[in-house]
From Swiss-Prot:
It comes from the Bacteria. It holds the Pfam family PRA-PH. GO terms for cellular component: cytoplasm. The gene is hisE. It is found in: Cytoplasm. This is Phosphoribosyl-ATP pyrophosphatase.
Amino acid sequence: MKTFETLFAELQDRAATRPEGSGTVAALDAGVHAQGKKVLEEAGEVWLAAEHESDESLAEEISQLLYWVQVLMVGRGLKLEDVYRHL
């Protein structure tokens, strides 16, 4: 099972090694604007799942939102500690 920290480490590794065919690399290459649009899309899906779907569906939507937030963080060069300072 992945944690927030292990997912972030995996995304940083993908950004550094740029494996061919990686969806994460494609998302990073698409830039902050595209990443931000995905964050908004996934946030809306989380909201809808919270109101109308099962806990399992909600958890899956939250995981997708966390993925895109982390892709955006990596794209901007932020570290987890940059965010943790504000929690």
